[in-house]
From Swiss-Prot:
Signal sequence segment: none
UniProt xrefs under HAMAP family: Shikimate_DH_AroE (MF_00222)
Broadest EC class assigned to this enzyme: oxidoreductase
Gene: aroE
Keyword NADP in annotation: yes
Name used for this protein in its record: Shikimate dehydrogenase (NADP(+))
Length: 280
């Protein structure tokens, strides 16, 4: 039986980003729609920097109910929302938008809780974990706060040091976060997270290869299809890591929390991770 609160008409949800042709989000939300018995469609829109704002605003003006934002527009979408949650105000990064009953566009971010869910599922993270994050873009802004809430000690490695410094200065009041430097080349990190978009273009980010040990947990927030490793994870495996995972679990978890924001129903995350793995 369809959820009576949303049975009047089909609900329009969307994904905005670039690139998007690889995205599994439409498939995930198709499964969610069946599970929670709410009839919503989920369409993808390829955007450019010049038309992103226009396309998203047109979507909401023409009956759009909610949307996800992916790379490279998570920081830009902060400028679209006219109301934001506390965490979004901290991170200045949005991956979920929802139109409220009084026509406000409210910004949320589910990347951080999605990542923590998956790192807990994999048993990768504990309080006080030493974590190296590769990258300093919108995806990193989305996840750092939740890692600091776990009392993790974070180091940021990015090819542009000034961007790392800006990020660190923004979040240092919430916990231990530092810019990676050459004095850490022999440091043993508990987790190394690739939060760059390099995998979308089929290459691994550059990082000191001597940081990989057999027990180093390597995590890529990107994911790959057909059970192939992402370029980053392939590199880590070849360097000797025995523990590595892509971000498929994070993707499903953040999507489920997005669904909860839109419809106040949380799909079964574990079941949908297993379902997706069996399909792709």
């Amino acid at each position: 039986m369809q959820n009576s609160k949303y049975c009047e008409k089909k609900i329009h949800i969307a994904l905005f980003g670039n690139p998007i042709e690889h995205s599994l989000s439409p498939l995930i939300h198709k499964n969610f729609s069946k599970e929670i018995k709410i009839n919503y469609n989920y369409n993808s829109f390829l955007c450019t920097k010049s038309n992103f704002f226009v396309i998203v605003k047109n979507f909401f003006q023409n009956g759009g109910f909610g949307c996800n934002i992916t790379v490279p527009f998570k920081k830009k979408s902060f400028q679209i929302s006219n109301k934001n949650t506390k965490y979004v105000k901290i991170s200045n990064s949005v991956n979920v938008l929802k139109k409220s009953s009084n026509n406000n566009i409210i910004g949320y971010n589910t990347d951080g809780i999605g990542l923590i869910y998956d790192l807990n599922r994999l048993k990768y993270i504990t309080e006080n974990s030493f974590i190296l994050i590769l990258g300093s873009g919108g995806a990193v802004y989305s996840i750092v706060y939740h890692l600091l809430k776990k009392k993790c000690c974070i180091f940021i490695l990015n090819r542009t040091i000034s961007k790392s410094c800006i990020l660190v200065n923004k979040f240092k009041k919430f916990g231990k976060i530092f810019v990676f430097d050459k004095n850490l080349y022999t440091k043993k990190f508990d987790i190394i997270i690739n939060a760059t978009s390099c995998g979308l273009y089929n290459f691994s980010p550059k990082f000191p290869k001597n940081l990989i040990f057999p027990n180093t947990k390597c995590y890529d927030i990107s994911y790959s299809k057909n059970k192939k490793l992402t370029p980053f994870l392939s590199t880590c495996r070849d360097l000797g890591s025995r523990k590595y995972s892509d971000g498929l679990g994070m993707l499903v978890a953040q999507a489920a929390y997005s669904c909860y924001i839109w419809f106040n129903i949380l799909p079964n995350i574990k079941k949908n991770i297993n379902l997706l793995k069996s399909i792709i």
